[in-house]
Amino acid sequence: MPTPATGAQRPPIRLRTPAPEDASAVLAAVAESRRLHAGRVSPPDTRALYRTWLERIGDGSYFGHFLVDDAGELAGVVNLSEVIRGGYQSAFLGYYVFAGYECQGIMSQGLRLVLPRAFGQYRLHRLEAAIQPGNIASRRLVENIGFHLEGVARRSVKIGGRWRDHERWAITAEQWRGRASRRRKA
């Protein structure tokens, strides 16, 4: 398990493609993070579910990314799921950190690595994030990287056996590129 970072110290994060040989490490990290994830996300917690997740990544309708620290340890996951092509070119953004990596800016770094890929390599036009209204940290995260609140979808996602309301946050490729351009000029 990682050593908590303090203040401005943030462990550098990089993206890594999930692979079959990661199953044991993922299942251990998920088990250690149950309390952290309870009621918010449902990551794969069995070998069968992990295999299914990998298969989805391979079918083109889903992009999965591991966030790994400088020691190669799993810090979190960023998924682009339910990819719709044609006139939409959109996907849903999902993410979570593992226990020991929360509140360190890890996910902010991770999303700043994934979004250029989403709007470049994956040729997406729009990303949407569904966030439970009480998840203040997640709301701040997406707002700080340029997502805009579009409304609330009532009882829209079933997590932990319960239907839960979710705020709908979104960003388009143009909005992302505009923010990136302004950051470079600053």
Give the residues covered by each predicted segment.
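Acyl-donor (CoA/ACP) binding surface of acyl/acetyltransferases
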Residues: 1-34, 68-186
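Conserved GNAT-fold acetyl-CoA-binding loop/helix
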Residues: 35-53
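Juxtamembrane/interface motifs at transmembrane-helix termini
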Residues: 44-48, 58, 96-97
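A short helix-loop-beta-strand connector motif used in the catalytic cores of GNAT acetyltransferases and
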Residues: 55-66
